[in-house]
C-alpha cells in the first residue's frame, strides 16, 4: 500500500459539512502510522495550521477605498459553509465599522466564489437599483466576473465603479483594468507548510509564524468617487 510521511491539506473545503468527519478519520489514520499532517486553510480542526491573515490586508483595502471617497459598498461573498468566505466577510464588515459604515443588506450577495455567478450577481444588483460605488469581491475569480459584467452594463471601471478582489491570482495584473486586490502569499504559505511538516516529522520546534500577513496591491480597478457619470453612482 502507498504511504506518505507528511500530508498538507489545502482549500476552503476543510469546513464543508459532511467532509469534516471523513477528513478527521483520514488524519487520525495518518498520524496513527507516524505521519505528520498540516492544514493550510482556515479551519477549526485540532491539527497544526498555517493560514493567511487576510484581516490586515482587508483593513488596508478598506482604508484605500475610503480614502478614495467610497462610502457605499457591495460585497460578493462565497458559499456560506466555507470558513474562508465567512472570515473574509467578517473582516470587511469590521473594517467598515471602524469608519462608521454599515453595509446595505441588499448589497450583500453570494457570488459562489465563481466568475459567472458573480457576474450575474452584479447585474442583478444594478437592475434592482441597489446603490454602491465599489464592489468588494471576496476572491479574485468573482472580481473577474464583475469586470466582465460591468463592461456589459456599460459601466467604466474605475470611473463609474471600483472593483476589488482577494488572492492576487497571476491573471489579475493582466486584466483590463488590472485588478486591485489583497495578495495572499501562496508560495510562502506552501514553503512554511512544508517546513512545519518536516519539523513535526523530526520532532523539533517550529518557530516561524503560523499566520502569514497579506498585503494590498493597488492597480487600476479602483478610483476616486465622483469621476464617473450618474449611471455609475449606485
Predicted regions and their residues:
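Bacterial carbohydrate/catabolite-sensing allosteric modules
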Residues: 3-8, 13-234
Amino acid at each position: 500500500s502507498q504511504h506518505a510521511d507528511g500530508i498538507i491539506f489545502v482549500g476552503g473545503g476543510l469546513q464543508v459539512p459532511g467532509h469534516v468527519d471523513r477528513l478527521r478519520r483520514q488524519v487520525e489514520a495518518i498520524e496513527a502510522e507516524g505521519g505528520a499532517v498540516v492544514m493550510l486553510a482556515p479551519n477549526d480542526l485540532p491539527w497544526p495550521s498555517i493560514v493567511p491573515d487576510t484581516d490586515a490586508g482587508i483593513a488596508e483595502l478598506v482604508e484605500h477605498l475610503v480614502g478614495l471617497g467610497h462610502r457605499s459598498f457591495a460585497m460578493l461573498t462565497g458559499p456560506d459553509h466555507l470558513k474562508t468566505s465567512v472570515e473574509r466577510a467578517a473582516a470587511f464588515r469590521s473594517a467598515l465599522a471602524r469608519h462608521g459604515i454599515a453595509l446595505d443588506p441588499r448589497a450583500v450577495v453570494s457570488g459562489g466564489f465563481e466568475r459567472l455567478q458573480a457576474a450575474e450577481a452584479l447585474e442583478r444588483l444594478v437592475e434592482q437599483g441597489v446603490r454602491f460605488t465599489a464592489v468588494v469581491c471576496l476572491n479574485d475569480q468573482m472580481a473577474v466576473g464583475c469586470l466582465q459584467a460591468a463592461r456589459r452594463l456599460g459601466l467604466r471601471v474605475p470611473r463609474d465603479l471600483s472593483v476589488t478582489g482577494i488572492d492576487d491570482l497571476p491573471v489579475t495584473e493582466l486584466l483590463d483594468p488590472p485588478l486591485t486586490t489583497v495578495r495572499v502569499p501562496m508560495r510562502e504559505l506552501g514553503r512554511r507548510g512544508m517546513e512545519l511538516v518536516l519539523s513535526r516529522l523530526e520532532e523539533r520546534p517550529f518557530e516561524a509564524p503560523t499566520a502569514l500577513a497579506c498585503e494590498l496591491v493597488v492597480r487600476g480597478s479602483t478610483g476616486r468617487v465622483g469621476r464617473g457619470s450618474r449611471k455609475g453612482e449606485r
